[in-house]
Amino acid sequence: MSSSDSVQRWEQKWSESRLVRRVPADQDAPRRRLELAELNVARAARERAAGDADAALIFAEQALINAADALLARDGYSANSHVVRFSYPRLPAVYVSERGLIDRIRSARNTAQYDARDSVPAGLAAQAIQLAERALGEVRAVL
């Protein structure tokens, strides 16, 4: 099965629920999203150094989203769901190989953002930043 077939099946699966849609080509969109990912990784590192693991993880998770969105934008898509976004077939392998960690990051982000402060372990925040840096590098390499 080709990459095009995988993308076509992905689009068909999610477009009916309106969680993914085609968007007009915008050559600057991938660059803008990568810049935002870089900014969010820097914010994550700054917050971790300041001792705020919650904020560090939230920014690192956002960087993962921004990097994935750069590839989606390059290919003319916009996703309204993390499940949809992170299942895009053309994402670098890190998004598949680290799926368990991404799920833990997402869950911890939800708790930190909506339920309870000081809920993110410092080690998980550090892992989130490392993963965001790795994903950003892999996305940059394929753009």
State where each predicted segment sits:
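Terminal alpha-helical segments
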Residues: M1-L143
